[in-house]
């Protein structure tokens, strides 16, 4: 089977990830579980010669790994990681949706579209690796593209979903190809007249600082963070800075944060997997807790904040049970 046929078969079986190496049988991940795939692994070296450019091949040789994205036929796009291991080069491939998903299809909290109307501020999407953060960000961009007149600038590593400008002008920049780092791309973005800035990941204190500055100066910033809950996301941002800077960062965050959407995936009774969400909205009470460093109280605020649209993972779980999904 060629790669297009493999991907078509994977889509048919709701595969999320493919693992390929010429030294052992192909495997794929379905509903979170790794299984043997019903096809022989293609020649990984040949695939990489086709998919990687000269710079990416040089990175793979020098660092032993490289991240990339590639488009195949039928508008199918893959996010890939090629890495050297004892038995040769391996490929881990994540299948991306061939279309921009709708927030309603993901079961996102109903208040999220209203939050996306904010003219400035920071909205975080958090969760473990493989929890669907990129898909949710893509749905947010898709919503804005249909409902807002704005300039959206994305900084991604690599570019995953490809957007066609509709009501919005959308420009996508890839780290390592169009700019060197998230921080340098974000610094440049402040001079490029965006209304919305999408950051693939908040990786370091410099990027976090610039993101907060952008959020304070009239931009809506959408970004991801690897944490398992909303309260942990706030703590992670603050803890990225030395002790003497924590209080100023708390003040910035208390003023500029709009919401933290955390998510995780569970096996769906019907098909594939279903997302569970936790949503923290920055109300005046939440802002005060952030400012005072009392993030341990945030879970209680979320639990009692349903009237403004907040939701806990447990409440989200009960909704999915009621829908017959879990």
Q: Language-model features: where?
A:
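Short, flexible helix-loop junctions that flank or precede catalytic/ligand sites
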Residues: 1-326
């Amino acid at each position: 089977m060629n790669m297009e046929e493999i991907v078509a078969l994977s889509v048919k079986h709701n595969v999320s990830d493919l693992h390929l190496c010429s030294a052992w049988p192909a495997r794929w991940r379905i509903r979170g579980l790794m299984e043997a795939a019903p096809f022989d692994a293609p020649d990984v070296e040949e695939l990489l010669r086709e998919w990687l450019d000269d710079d990416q091949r040089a990175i793979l040789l020098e660092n032993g790994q490289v991240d990339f994205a590639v488009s195949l036929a039928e508008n199918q796009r893959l996010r890939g990681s090629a890495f050297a291991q004892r038995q040769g080069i391996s490929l881990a491939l994540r299948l991306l949706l061939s279309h921009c998903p709708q927030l309603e299809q993901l079961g996102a909290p109903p208040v999220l579209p209203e939050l996306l109307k904010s003219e400035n501020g920071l909205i975080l999407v958090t969760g473990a690796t493989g929890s669907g953060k990129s898909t949710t960000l893509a749905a947010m961009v898709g919503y804005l593209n249909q409902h807002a007149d704005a300039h959206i600038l994305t900084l991604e590593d690599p570019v995953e979903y490809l957007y066609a400008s509709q009501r919005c002008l959308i420009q996508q920049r890839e780290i390592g190809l169009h700019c060197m780092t998230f921080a340098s791309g974000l610094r440049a973005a402040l001079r490029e007249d965006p209304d919305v800035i999408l950051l693939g990941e908040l990786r370091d204190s410099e990027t976090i600082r610039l993101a907060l500055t952008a959020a304070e100066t009239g931009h809506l910033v959408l970004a991801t963070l690897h944490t398992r809950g909303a309260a942990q996301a706030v703590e992670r941002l603050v803890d990225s800075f030395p002790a003497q800077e924590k209080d100023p960062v708390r003040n910035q965050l208390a003023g500029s944060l709009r919401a933290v959407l955390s998510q995780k995936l569970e096996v769906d009774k019907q098909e594939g997997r279903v997302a569970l969400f936790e949503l923290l909205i920055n109300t005046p009470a939440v802002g005060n807790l952030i400012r005072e460093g009392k993030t341990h109280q945030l879970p209680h605020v979320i639990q009692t904040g349903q009237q403004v649209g907040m939701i806990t993972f447990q409440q989200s779980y009960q909704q999915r049970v009621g829908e017959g999904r879990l």
